[in-house]
C-alpha cells in the first residue's frame, strides 16, 4: 500500500484497519520507496528499544532509502545516532539541558503565554495556531538557545518549509536548510566570543572527562532542539486545544478540576500526538517483528500514533478520557531515544492550556473547516479558529 493513501485525512481509521489485519505491513514509504510499517503497541514499543534497528542511514541497503537528508553539519544529531556515539552526545547534552533548567523555564513560559493572550483582547475570534500555539514555543526555544528576537520569525518560516513543504516550491526546503546552517554558523561563533546565559553557550562549554561536543555536533544539536522542540510543541498545544473543544464533557471536567491537567497532557499526547510516524530505522541484521522477518538494511517505519490507539493497550482508545492513565503512550518515544525534550514539551503544553482556560471561560471552536497539515512528520492543524 501507499502510506499516504488516506492516512493524512483519516489516519486512525487507516491505522485501525492495518492493526486488525496484520502486525507488520509492506508499504510504499513517504519517500516513495518500499518499507515496512509497524502499528501494534507491543511491536512498536519493542522496535523503538531494539538496538538492532539502527537510526544511522549508513545501515540502509544502497538505493533503498531516499528520504529526507540534511547536510553533514546538521545530520550529526541524536536522531541519526546509535551507541556509542549517541550515548556520548546525550551524556554531554544532559549536563547542560538539566531538569533544573527546564523547571526554571516555567515562569518565563507563563509570562509569554499571558502576553500572547493579552494581545488577543478579552473577547473576539482568532486563529489560535498563529496567535498562540506557534509563537509560544518558538519564543521559549529561542530564549533557551539565546537566539535574538529579530530572528524568530525566520525560524518559524524555515521550520514550516521543512515539515510541510509546498509542492509548488520544492526549493523552499533546501533554501531553509542552507539558511539555518548559515545562521547557526554565525550564532556559534558569536556565542564562543561572548557566552550568554543560555543552553547553546552551555553546550559549547560543557565537558565530560576532557570530552566535548564537536562543531558539527553543536550545529546539529542546535538545529534539532529548535526544529523538534518547536514543531512538536506547536502540534501538541494545538491538537490538545482542538481535542478539548471537540469534547465539551472533558472540557467541563477540566474546568471543574484543574488538577487533572498534568494527566490530561499525557492523554492529549496519546490521543492526538504531534506526528503520525517516528523516524525511520534500518535493521543491522535480519529482524523478526510481530512474526514477520524484515531483512537487514530495509527501511522500517514505526507508528506511535497507531500504537497509542491500540485497544490491546488502551481500552476504548478512540475516546478522549482525561481520567485515563495514559502513561506508557509512545508519542515521546521509548528506550534510549526517548525524547530529551519531553519535560519541556509537557511543561509548555500544561502551562499553555492552563493560561488559556483561565483567561477565556467561553472559549469555543469558531467557524470554518479544520485543515490538517499535509505531512506525516507533523500531525497538526494549519489553523485553529476559535471564539472567546
Q: Can you annotate each of these PLM segments?
A:
Residues 1-388:
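Cytochrome P450
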